[in-house]
Amino acid sequence: MLQQIRGPADLQHLSQAQLRELAQEIREFLVHKVAATGGHLGPNLGVVELTLALHRVFDSPHDPIIFDTGHQTYVHKMLTGRAQDFESLRKKGGLSGYPCRAESEHDWVESSHASAALSYADGLSKAFELSGLRNRHVVAVVGDGALTGGMCWEALNNIAASHRPVVIVVNDNGRSYAPTIGGVADHLAKLRLQPAYEQVLEKGRDVVRAVPLVGEVCYHFMHSVKAGIKDSLSPQLLFTDLGLKYVGPVDGHDERAVEVALRSARGFGGPVIVHVVTRKGMGYGPAEADVAEQMHSTVPIDPATGQATKLAGPGWTTTFADALIEYAGKRRDIVAITAAMPGPTGLTAFGQQFPDRLFDVGIAEQHAMTSAAGLAMGGMHPVVAIYSTFLNRAFDQIMMDVALHQLPVTMVLDRAGITGSDGPSHNGMWDLSMLGIIPGIRVAAPRDATRLREELGEALDVDDGPTALRFPKGDVGEDIPALERRDGMDVLAVPASGLNHDVLLIAVGALASMALAVAKRLHNQGIGVTVIDPRWVLPVADGIGDLAVAHKLVVTLEDNGVNGGVGSAVSAALRRAEIGVHCRDVGLPQQFFEHASRGELLADLRLTDQDVARRVTGWVAALGACVSEAEIKEHLD
């Protein structure tokens, strides 16, 4: 049946029995396809019926449907004519794992950073009103943690004050509300329905009513208090108190019930909340059995078991996690903060070992950073573990709440540099540029597992300002020993005997292995290369100037944007020191990159060791070294 769905219009004639059959087929399709490619399986299994209902009730793309945390759009893609492309999911030139405007007119925004959909919806509804397009609804689907982000509530505050037709679908899969709201409300609702509770309540009612004169009055008073407490904790009041109409809660796996609720909401003609309760991982045993994450995001798996088809080697994240636990075991002042991602950032084990020292603040990076500042003011040393790309959201807090106060907060930036298959929104290629302008911050980029452990320890010993460590996604690789330590920097290679000191190659973090491969190629051409790892890449160490004066050319190699990165900082530092050596930056161009593997992107950007060696050889030749173009090609090909 799925093969017959070319667009939302094909859903309109289906019966309820056919819709149930289609939902089952979609789930089987999801498991089969995502098992092969990897991707966000659990969230999409949970929104099958909801997405079917959305496309039956609303006229996409005339009525924009905006998915917050865009990883829950796989079913939306299937229903808008892209099911045949799922073999290429998250692969170069294939289907994006997030909404993509270039793929379909049904994808309005390329959303992947959480809590933004309501603001998009607010703006779109205003634009439609100003353009006289009053017959267009805007639908925003939030949930999967997005409502823990403050931006959602800022948008709700504005939407509620309007009369524009914005339909907000809250996908409540158990991860949408903060525990003090959703957890207590759900607990009371379950408790009230338990037979044992009802029996106790019945006996208590009889006892109280039996008291002479005041019994009946006391009973009604106690019943009113109980009802008031329950109502005050109800999710509905979160929204109705803002002036929003509310429909629900609705069983999100009953397509007909969801459809009825959405049609009712569409008829209001103003802002309305539709509260839909779903189960992440619905219909797939291994996902439902994964209590921690419901298989939120997976690598390629065996669909029969849910187990990974390839065992990963030791990873950067695991290395960090183990080291942090080791340091925290020796120091009670070390605490950790995560923005709703304890598993992906390696903090789950930390929380199990030190449950009172891990703080999951939800998708609230701004709050995470200023809360860390408060912890530091109180004598703690907080470690904020966060994806590099999400650090952008907390820039003002890092600058004004942490750095201005010279507070010892350590930021650990996972997924730095090119991450690949998650696409342009997840590459961590701006952190060095952003952090480089913050006064007093120190930034380390470990090249291997040993250096990660060492530099984390060094960061935790800093007590007069913020620090940051950055490392990429994936396996950590072999350790790279240093030949010597010089002025706090590691020298990894020196010119071979008989060669001049032609090039000083400064390697940033995990690109040290590439730098050594480049140096080997250049040595084979008679170009002498010194390779150093500064360890702490920002601010620029004074010792770099001392090394630079002994070379003809300084080249920086980094997986950050070349604008404002380490290369820019090194060039500026050498100019300030009036060191006249030539400088060149090798890094990422200032643009957004489509999804592909890390290796494919580096090859496309000419950031392989062969490409970099060819560029450096050309620069050396331009400075007067006797290397011909023919020799360059002969040795590099």
Swiss-Prot record:
Record GO cellular component, one term: cytosol
Lineage of the species this protein comes from: Bacteria, Bacillati, Actinomycetota, Actinomycetes, Mycobacteriales
Signal peptide location: none
UniProt entry tagged with the keyword Transferase: yes
Pfam families per the UniProt record, alphabetical: DXP_synthase_N, Transket_pyr, Transketolase_C
Protein name: 1-deoxy-D-xylulose-5-phosphate synthase
Gene this protein is translated from: dxs
Record keywords, A-Z: Isoprene biosynthesis, Magnesium, Metal-binding, Thiamine biosynthesis, Thiamine pyrophosphate, Transferase
Enzyme Commission identifier(s): 2.2.1.7
UniProt cross-references to NCBIfam families, sorted A to Z: dxs, PRK05444.2-2
